[in-house]
């Protein structure tokens, strides 16, 4: 955790209430926070009679590492369990979330599983943009086929809630092998597949929820942090943005000239967004504004690329 004082109590408490597990430990690393993160986490750990919760202070970030990757790598070295559960501080899980996820993992004979939490949006911008990631998965990937594949290009993951078999994680190299990758969740899933380990994203909306941002400024900063890398390189971003424009914005632009064609394509994209929202219990009321959301997403992609090229991207006080 880095400067997560508002999330410390909720994160640790929801994790500590897990049932259906024979044994578990909660490891918290304070990544050189400048707020009360360590104090709050340490106080919670000391208030528990058992040694379930352990709090560590992170050291200086080594050269070549990104902060989150080094923190997770450090925690993985301290962990003693058969499974590693990586959980963002802003995620809240219900009491059976981990046991249910592990059961699904075992039933499919996977090495990792990534339950996608229900996204809680605060404000218009978050409700407009946040559902796009889930929609992009469901509209461009056949997840049932992707989860059976070992092709790294079909891997999808969400680092908010990620469970992996500890032995397989270490065999593939773990976060040390992706120490400088800003999209650590996706790169870890690709790394697992390169090592012939299967896994997938699953709908986690019934067992977990996440409020990533509290205002529009945080959302913009969060998207800026990673979108420059989301599609491989600038050419990939241009190609994806062009496809998004053609499929989601162009139908609206041609309505005055080719009303029926434009309306048909708009309704198709609208229904795909609604179908995803219903399936994942995500935000529905912004679905009619999908073209606006896509326009904003394209803007954020190229804003991220621009700022990365200027070397002016920062996250939690560290340059990316």
Residue ranges: model-predicted function:
Residues 244-312:
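Membrane-embedded multi-pass helical conduit in multi-pass membrane proteins
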């Amino acid at each position: 955790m880095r400067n997560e004082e508002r999330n410390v109590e909720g994160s640790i408490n929801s994790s500590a209430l897990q049932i259906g597990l024979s044994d578990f430990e909660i490891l918290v690393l304070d990544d050189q926070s400048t707020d009360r993160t360590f104090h709050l986490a340490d106080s919670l750990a000391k208030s528990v009679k058992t040694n379930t919760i352990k709090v560590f202070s992170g050291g200086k970030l080594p050269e070549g590492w990104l902060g989150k990757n080094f923190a997770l790598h450090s925690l993985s070295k301290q962990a003693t369990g058969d499974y590693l559960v990586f959980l963002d501080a802003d995620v809240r899980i219900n009491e059976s979330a981990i046991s249910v996820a592990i059961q699904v993992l075992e039933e499919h004979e996977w090495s990792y599983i990534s339950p996608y939490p229900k996204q809680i949006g605060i404000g218009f911008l978050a409700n407009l943009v946040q559902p796009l990631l889930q929609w992009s998965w469901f509209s461009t990937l056949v997840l049932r086929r992707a989860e059976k594949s070992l092709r790294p290009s079909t891997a999808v993951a969400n680092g908010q809630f990620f469970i992996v078999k500890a032995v397989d994680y270490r065999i593939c190299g773990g976060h040390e092998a992706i120490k400088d990758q800003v999209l650590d969740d996706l790169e870890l899933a690709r790394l697992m597949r390169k090592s012939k380990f299967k896994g997938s994203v699953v709908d986690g909306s019934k067992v977990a929820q996440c409020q990533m941002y509290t205002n529009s400024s945080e959302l913009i900063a969060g998207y800026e942090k990673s979108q420059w890398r989301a599609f491989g390189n600038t050419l990939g971003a241009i190609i994806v943005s062009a496809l998004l424009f053609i499929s989601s914005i162009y139908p609206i632009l041609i309505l005055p000239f080719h009303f029926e064609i434009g309306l048909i394509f708009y309704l198709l994209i609208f229904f795909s967004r609604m179908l995803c929202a219903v399936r994942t219990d995500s935000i529905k009321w912004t679905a009619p504004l999908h073209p606006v959301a896509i326009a904003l997403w394209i803007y954020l992609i190229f804003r991220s690329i621009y700022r990365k090229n200027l070397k002016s991207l920062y996250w939690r006080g560290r340059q990316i």
